[in-house]
Amino acid sequence: MTDLRHYDVIVSPSITEKSTLVSDFNQVVFNVARTASKPEIKAAVEALFGVKVTAVNTLLRKGKTKRFRGFAGKQKDVKKAIVTLAEGQSIDVSTGL
């Protein structure tokens, strides 16, 4: 049985041009919770998708400053995780959990 906390760690898959390029190197990119640590991300991916994770790299993308109707606002900061999978394993991120 999957722990419900794993669903709080993984927010969504990140489908971008760069994330499709790193899929050739057996890597998958996820948007994750800002408070999530690398061991929590590794445990969540292994539990939810049933794969073996060899490495987790994280980055924090700062939100851009935008103007809306004359007022300055700021987009949210987003934490991303680049998850490297073991040889021969893959995740189909186009299907839901």
Curated annotation (Swiss-Prot):
The keyword Nucleotide-binding does not apply. GO terms for biological process: translation. Pfam families: Ribosomal_L23. GO terms for molecular function: rRNA binding; structural constituent of ribosome. Keywords: Ribonucleoprotein, Ribosomal protein, RNA-binding, rRNA-binding. GO terms for cellular component: ribonucleoprotein complex; ribosome. Part of the 50S ribosomal subunit. Contacts protein L29, and trigger factor when it is bound to the ribosome. One of the early assembly proteins it binds 23S rRNA. One of the proteins that surrounds the polypeptide exit tunnel on the outside of the ribosome. Forms the main docking site for trigger factor binding to the ribosome. Belongs to the universal ribosomal protein uL23 family. This is Large ribosomal subunit protein uL23. It comes from Allorhizobium ampelinum (strain ATCC BAA-846 / DSM 112012 / S4).
